[in-house]
Amino acid sequence: MIIKYPDGSQKEYESGVKVSQITGDISEGLLRQSLGAVVNGEILGLDDKVYEDSDFKVVKFEDKEGKQIFWHTASHIMAYAIQELYPDTKFAIGPSTETGFYYDLDLEHRFVEEDFKAIEDKMKEIAKEDLPVEKIEISREEALKYFKEKGQDYKVELIEDLPADEKITMYKIGDFLDLCKGPHLLSTKKIKAIKLLSIAGAYWRGDSNNKMLQRLYGIAFEKQSQLEEYITRREEAEKRDHRKLGKELDLFSMHEEGPGFPFFHPNGMILRNNLLNWWRGVLEENGYGEILTPIILNEALWHRSGHWDHYKDNMYFTKIDEGDYAVKPMNCPGSILVYNSNNHSYRDLPIRLAEYGIVHRHELSGALHGLFRVRTFTQDDAHVYCLFSQVKDEVFKMIDLADYLYSTFGFKYSIELSTRPDDYMGELDAWNLAEKSLKEALEEKNLPYTINEGDGAFYGPKIDFHLEDAIGRTWQCGTIQLDFQLPENFDLTYVDENGERQRPVMLHRALLGSVERFMGILIEHFAGKFPLWLSPVQVEVIPVSDKFKDFAESIADKLHAAGLRVHLDGRAEKVGYKIREAQVKKINYMLVIGEKEETSGKLSVRKRNGEEVQDVDVDEFIASLKEEIKNKTITD
């Protein structure tokens, strides 16, 4: 078999060679650092074997796949420690996540943070022993017998739900044996730093009809210094938590009367409307027409589009005049109906249709998280209908739009190309052509990208944009998707130069993504200190006493007349208190108005960062703020 490496080189091996041998043949140093490999898009551990021609990429801890292996093993070590300390525990599931790992546990003892140290100490003890992590393949009957004897009901249920011919794998660390597909580290010794983070409730299988389990979250690293750096970042992230700042800045709230459905307050609507109005203008300048399509559409539409098979478990349904309808989880079919409502010539293409469409998806209650994970959100979708010869140019334009959007907010970004998933729709040749087109577009733009095997949409491959925020976290936001399938499903056509009907190509594009989620990211990225153009209140006017209130009002009125968002704090409170409160609200500028200001007609300006400027002309102050707004300047 042939093993192909990322640099294009290749080597021949006998079938059945271990990942560790292939890695070691590259270099012994690399083997010492490696945690596994991505083989034909699948993550394998060092002890796993390769049986066929493969694309082979070694992964280390800094790679997301490496972290997945590392943290998965850490979750098993945590479970082993808990088995030692609380022998009656029943274990549910314990995966790695993007930010660490957790294990869902069923036991009488209710965990509190004071329990964490004993568990951490036991985990460190296990890790230090350099125990091998052994993969064991057994029959379904043996696995059921083992877990029934142990009283591990959740594992029994998981096995019984597997297909009859499913291969059962277990992993063993010391005296702890767990049902698991893996992959894992070779041994426990690489895990040098461990911290338990929190405890939460989680229904078994996410179903509120099932028992509430205890979910214990943790993190682990190769070095203590990495853990210390993580703790610092986590503390900063907690200060920036958009749920906390959303309340402090009076932007939005969540209520038990509508879990997962955000309520935006006036301040939040100013932020939202300024963001969307600006983006609307950008899209108009770039040749997009805006549409609005219904929230509720006939159920048959979702069968035709293919969304039914992929989204039905997360959709909301209703009946209208005895007909079956669904609340839309996606905007694409509505856009398609708009396109199909007219005849089109090749001269009309490309047609660019943008929509700020409200979609609904049923998320499990345990998955809801502020604005990041909601049940209703506005998606800044656009769909471009074009000739195949226009695809590359349209993708170029979309990439340029993405760059303009993200750089406006000071985000750095990386790009992933996500390829054909297992549940893809359509013909393989069309998929290969679509993937090739997106690759060529990225390469002609000289943009570095990584391949995310098997993570494309069911109807086409996609380019994903991952933003890096002010404290180094990454967020997947924008996406560009190439689709040959939905035009086929909906019989989309245009008339070519010969008068023949032809099929257009459809490009899906969302760059903000979920507007609510993007707002949450902005809140945390800026820590609530928004650029002036987005700030709900741009200037706070603070008279030092009632004596100067009239002059302060005249200044506030002049600023307001100039189009600035101004608040006059005329309360009978001490000036220092009012300044501190304005700082807590993260208002960009504070104007303290007293005798000197009234006499001179000049302003004393205090910036959000504490910098003070005296004797500022009112008109010059207004002009400088207008310039800051126009340039979308990022301060602080």
Where are these regions (language model features)?
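NTP/phosphate- and nucleic-acid-binding module
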Residues: M1-A92, T97-D636
